[in-house]
């Protein structure tokens, strides 16, 4: 089985108050299950993008092939996460 890249999800912007208590600067190592302490709604929104980055994929609309941004689905208190692929050790 090919190795998978690590992906870090970092909160880079916030409007309103997150019901899960997330704040700008929070970081999570994304795996195949919801990281401890991460809102499950946010995880469900970013999981498909994180999976693509983990397997070496990229997004044609991004300038950096190792990252993308994803918003959580809360329309009244949105957070934006930056997903960044890390190197394989």
State what each model feature region is:
Residues 40-57:
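Short, compositionally biased
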Residues 1-9:
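Short, basic/aromatic beta-hairpin or loop at an interaction surface
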Residues 15-16, 33-38:
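Short, charged beta-turn/beta-strand-edge "cap" motif at the junction between a beta-strand
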Residues 3, 60-89:
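Short, compact, well-ordered microdomains
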Residues 9-19:
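Short acidic, Pro/Gly- and aromatic-enriched capping/linker segments at domain boundaries
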